[in-house]
């Protein structure tokens, strides 16, 4: 999971590493 990833998914950390 990259914390600086451009892809953001709702309620998912698969692409960003951040909970959105």
UniProtKB/Swiss-Prot annotation:
Source species, domain of life: Bacteria
Keywords, in A-Z order: Ribonucleoprotein, Ribosomal protein
One annotated Gene Ontology cellular component of this protein: ribonucleoprotein complex
Family label: Belongs to the bacterial ribosomal protein bL33 family.
Designated name of the protein: Large ribosomal subunit protein bL33
Organism in which the protein naturally occurs: Brevundimonas vesicularis
Designated gene of the protein: rpmG
């Amino acid at each position: 999971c990259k914390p600086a990833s451009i892809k953001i998914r709702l309620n998912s950390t698969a692409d960003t590493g951040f909970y959105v």
